[in-house]
Amino acid sequence: MTTDVKEKATFKLLDLIDSVTGKKSLLLERDLSGILGQIVTTNTLQEHGIPQVYWFNENIPNDIEKKTIYLCRPTYENAKLVATHVRQFQRDMLRIESTVIVLPTSNILFETVLQEEGVFGELLVTEWPLHAVPLDKDLLSLELGPEKLEESLLQRSTDALIDFERTHGRFPRVSGRGPYAAKMLELLEKTYQEEATINFGKVEGEISALYDSVLLVDRSLDRITPFLTQLTYFGFLDEILGIQQMNVKLPSSLVNRNEASNTGPMKKFSLSSSSSQITKEIRDINFNCIGPYLSKIARKLSSDFEGRRQAKTVNQIRDFVSKLGSLQSEHTSLNIHTGLAETLVQHTKNNYFQKLLQLQHLLVSHADSFTQFNLLDEIIYAEAPVEEVFRVLCLASITTNGLRRKDIDHYRREITQTYGYYHLLTFQALIDAGLLRLRQSTNISLQKSLSYSTWLNTYPLVKDEVDEQNPEDIAYTYSGYGPLSVHIAYDILKGRDNEEKILKLQNMPGTYVDKWTLDQEKVMPKNLKTNVPGKRRVLVFFIGGCTYTELAAFRLLQEKEDLYEFTFMTTGMVTGSSLIRAFIPNIESLNE
């Protein structure tokens, strides 16, 4: 589904590279390495005149080519660094032809710094308009961090959506819920109005014949889901090891079983569904089922390998040989996933892990008990990562309409004494962001959050019994809790064309938006196409980030209800810990 986006990005990048003729060096911003790897291979770069890629930092490679390309984001720091390089070239009397490729677009700050440094005329600045990175066949990401400012996040989201429409046509319909969904719709309309004014009333682009609509999912309506521990395979992997641009870093011995120790450099392993059928099959299953599932795959592969003994005729042997490469690749993938699963299982044996899951379930179930505070004390005494502790506090604050002052004071003291006094700043940052709140009413021991109570009474968020092996309900993703964001979004899809349900949708918390692109398009285009007959294709856009469990929940609905075919775009992939880390101060900067 994202193939067109990748092909377009690849063509544009190679065109920019080829505009610099001959051999050239590529200096790459380190944080963009995963993104570049999603678009082109090292071999492709070599075919286009780049024999080697260097990291873009203060050190200039000794064997740099006479023509140099910088690939970076248009930040103040990068502009200063480019200027430092150019001045060094001048001091060394090197005639280096420098080209800067920024993504997705340049900006006034970047170019102003280059001008003030006196190097703007010494280089060429071009743009690689990669607004969203294709991470998988059904997933695009803007790769924005959780700390991205509101205005910038909304503008980048709007730009990415419009760029997607340039390839696939304008969405006939925009639906969603929440303040950021409403603001993004306003930005979309404003952009197209400005375009119409410039083009004398004409707006570029035809109505999409591929997509039914875009569904805006506002993270601010569901802060709960990211703070829970993800229990799907990919979700748990992201929690424990971290997934970057659909790659996970592993010890060399895990990738290559011939290496005896873990002392070698870490290696990347692709989690893209296109890289392995096994990966696609297991990415969304509940982690409790990963062992039996991998055993089942191992037995099947073993049976397939036995086919070589049964191959007797030339045709049978030829058929087996044609499959051998694929079988060996899947066998390697199975070994790596088995090693990953073993690593994750070891984490579940930590003395705080089960208490953490129990505490989270108590909070989302609205259990009126002080048990959760006793459990949190035990988790702190077990010296669980500080991010986990703050996740629980934020979860408690959201689900119980704020924390009592004495509880905030108690945990501020416990956390600073256990993890460091600089976390006083973390506390304040979370309070300023509204993730930790002081309860206004103190006469109820554990007052329920009005908004969360509304959602809890509206949707079956919590399930006491869930079939994790053969799931029928999205609550399998958290072993008893179904992501609120998915319930809200899917309710809109099912109810927006039902007159009886529209009033209910309009009266629920969070601004409800549902707008047709053009009045005359209230009848869907007759040539609307999907990969599966009878299904309506929808782009689900997560404003503020999404988790792998939410993707798994949508995919389950896609499979079970057979009504929609989803493509996902998100401002970034998040976990509760990555959200918390955005509020933790940098110790090094504090010591300067």
Curated annotation (Swiss-Prot):
GO MF annotations in UniProt: ATP binding
Stated name of the protein: Vacuolar protein sorting-associated protein 33
BP term (GO), one: vacuole fusion, non-autophagic
Key words of the record: Protein transport, Transport
UniProt function note: Essential for vacuolar biogenesis, maturation and function. Involved in the sorting of vacuolar proteins from the Golgi apparatus and their targeting to the vacuole.
Protein family (similarity comment): Belongs to the STXBP/unc-18/SEC1 family.
Matching InterPro entries: Sec-1-like_dom1 (IPR043154), Sec-1-like_dom3a (IPR043127), Sec1-like (IPR001619), Sec1-like_dom2 (IPR027482), Sec1-like_sf (IPR036045), VPS33_dom3b (IPR043155)
GO cellular component: CORVET complex; fungal-type vacuole; vacuolar HOPS complex
Entries under PANTHER family matching the protein: VESICLE PROTEIN SORTING-ASSOCIATED (PTHR11679)
Organism: Schizosaccharomyces pombe (strain 972 / ATCC 24843)
Domain of life of the organism encoding this protein: Eukaryota
Signal peptide limits: none
